[in-house]
Amino acid sequence: MRILVEIAYQGNNFLGFQIQQNGRTVQQQFEKLLQRIHKRHVRIHPSSRTDRGVHAIQQYFHFDTDLNIPMSQWQYAMNRTLPDDIYVNNVVTVDDDFHCRYDCVGKRYRYKVYQAQQRDPFQSGLKTFIPEPLDLDKMNRAAQQFIGTHDFTGFCSQKTEVESKVRTLYQSEIVKTDDGFDYIVTGSGFLYNMVRVLVAFLIEVGKGRHEVSDVPKLLESKNRKNVPFTAPAEGLYLEKIYLDENELLKDFGNDIKIHRKKSL
């Protein structure tokens, strides 16, 4: 039986989602828990592998089990055992051919920034602090330029190993908040550090160091040296995972280009 688990976590005290030889990770917490229940190792398969310090409002993973335990009991047992910075929101059964990674057709990230004259220790780890004034309207116009299908070679980590760096963004916008702004981006998928590089670039636009018209040229150049900065992990949230193609079409229209992970 294949089980799908929806979770949320605060990333401050994790080295990321993926298991590491030394250090606390989200995958480690769940596989340790499942091993106690099954008396053997059980591997989990996530929809996304968030980096160190990145939070998740909605994340999924699946695992296979031969235990006949009601779904409500799975959720209760997990939440009773897990630490305070992880929570299981839902547990359901899925078809045996379902795969969390390959059936994911889209993801939405939110990057949170607060602006003030001085740093707020109660925001630390949850939002990124920027004291300088920023031109949010200009940043939003630049953000809109990323919507569509592009090669994001110049906007991801040079450690990115995937061959194709073409991704489709359905949403890319700056939203003003009471204490700063959020950058919201939804796409078919994201490259290593891509969202944090986009945020860092948009902040440079807001400071007047780049123009809106630079975006097409930087995309075409495919050179990371032209966009050298990466925003901190602390303000980044994995906000939504799209496992249903119809949900993505409902949010962004029937004319969008749908990608499946096996085609990326």
UniProtKB/Swiss-Prot annotation:
<keyword id="KW-0413">Isomerase</keyword>
<protein>
    <recommendedName>
        <fullName>tRNA pseudouridine synthase A</fullName>
        <ecNumber>5.4.99.12</ecNumber>
    </recommendedName>
</protein>
<keyword id="KW-0819">tRNA processing</keyword>
<comment type="similarity">
    <text>Belongs to the tRNA pseudouridine synthase TruA family.</text>
</comment>
<feature type="binding site">
    <location>
        <position position="109"/>
    </location>
    <ligand>
        <name>substrate</name>
    </ligand>
</feature>
<dbReference type="GO" id="GO:0031119">
    <property type="term" value="P:tRNA pseudouridine synthesis"/>
</dbReference>
<comment type="subunit">
    <text>Homodimer.</text>
</comment>
<dbReference type="InterPro" id="IPR001406">
    <property type="entry name" value="PsdUridine_synth_TruA"/>
</dbReference>
<dbReference type="GO" id="GO:0003723">
    <property type="term" value="F:RNA binding"/>
</dbReference>
<feature type="active site" description="Nucleophile">
    <location>
        <position position="51"/>
    </location>
</feature>
<dbReference type="GO" id="GO:0160147">
    <property type="term" value="F:tRNA pseudouridine(38-40) synthase activity"/>
</dbReference>
<comment type="function">
    <text>Formation of pseudouridine at positions 38, 39 and 40 in the anticodon stem and loop of transfer RNAs.</text>
</comment>
<dbReference type="InterPro" id="IPR020097">
    <property type="entry name" value="PsdUridine_synth_TruA_a/b_dom"/>
</dbReference>
<dbReference type="Pfam" id="PF01416">
    <property type="entry name" value="PseudoU_synth_1"/>
</dbReference>
<dbReference type="InterPro" id="IPR020103">
    <property type="entry name" value="PsdUridine_synth_cat_dom_sf"/>
</dbReference>
<dbReference type="InterPro" id="IPR020095">
    <property type="entry name" value="PsdUridine_synth_TruA_C"/>
</dbReference>
<dbReference type="InterPro" id="IPR020094">
    <property type="entry name" value="TruA/RsuA/RluB/E/F_N"/>
</dbReference>
